[in-house]
Amino acid sequence: MDQATVDFWQNHSLQFLEMALRTDKRQVLKDADGYGKLSRECGDTVEIFLMVRNGRIRSAAFETDGCLFAVVCANTVAHLVEGKTLQGALALTPDSVIDYLETLPAEESHCAEQAIQVLRLAIANARENERQPWKKFYARR
């Protein structure tokens, strides 16, 4: 192994590494109750899908064409929101993601900000779909 590879494994927390390697939440949830999508000026796009039952996020997933840090942050958001109420999920902040990961480089904090912005869009969409359920079936992607 070269030094950069060794440094990557040694320089990151277990939570960061788990979110970097875990793939079960990286998927499109068909018929999601809430959906958010945001592209940054650099071209990275993050999508978040929420399944909501009885006011709680039963399942969350994401898709991105972004870098490793975009994956890690979106995966963290999907992980942290499951089981929370929509209001409880709104309490998450970029700092919540950064604190959970422990070793997200400061220059990549915009990835945490983007993931939280997309979560808020997905929550707003879920609330809109609660008020007007027929909108849930409109094409979103």
Q: Residues of each region from the PLM?
A:
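Short, thiol/selenol-centered motifs that function as redox-active sites or metal-ligating centers
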Residues: 64-72
